[in-house]
Amino acid sequence: MALDDRRTLYVCDARIGDIRKFDDFGTLLGTIGRKGSGPGEFDRPVEVEVRGDRVFVRDLGRSRMFVFDLEGKLVSSTPVDEREGRWRKFRALPDGRFVVEMETAGETRLELFSAGFSRQKTLYRKAVPRSRIAVGPLREDIPLPFVPVVEWDVTPEGLIVAGYSGDYSLEILDPDKGRVAAWTRSFKPFEVADKDRKDYLAGPGRDLPAEAVRTLVFPKTKPAFEKLVVNGRGRIWTFLPSADPKERTVFEAFDADGAFRSRVILEDEWPRTAPVVFFVGGVWMAVAGPDGETSIVRYQITN
């Protein structure tokens, strides 16, 4: 999901194959693109970003980056070059450049790209254990359980916050000046219990072949945090794992300069994998219901 300067919400629907526009009250304003193989048509759109008067859509199925104006007119289409690593995520900076998460065997990198999607330099790199396996006849990509990963987000001012959940190390990066802050927070890891193993194997999309289940190795402990986001005021939130999945959601909040602010317990559940997009004073979230249907919900964030 993404927001433009008028707080119009853009929702990327990979299954239907379009981008849906909503106003601040959730009224459908229109769509961008459609399923197909022609100019400006999608196979499997997986990410959307908006900067200024341009909408950027990454299509995984066609391996292309599409650029539209705010009304949905196609401006350009560029192939996604994955020869130097697999694209996992991209975010637009306020000045029109992009940060792309690229993954190779044993390493995650954050690369800076120009407004025209040409690679400029590496902003961050981290050696990481293998986090996914390919299973089934279609070699479907399945995340491995409780493996430390790199999580990152972009502040409203255009700084990049990157963290490694293996050791709770965090960095704030300026795309031009480099690292401006770095720190490591101490933590006591939770053990991976038998219930965690059973819940993982019973999760959606985890109908693994018997051979994959037998060879799957679970780590002894959980990573330091499960998700990192930057809210609409530039504060950093790291969502912590728990010993019991039924416990309420807990995150730690840091100021924009990295100073620890507080530990917060939420009254409502916050799905760890839910796509979110922040604005000042609130957040839009894609929440999956028990019937498998996804709802787009707006929440107010209070002090």
Model-derived regions: residue spans:
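Eukaryotic scaffold repeat domains enriched in small/polar residues
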Residues: 1-303
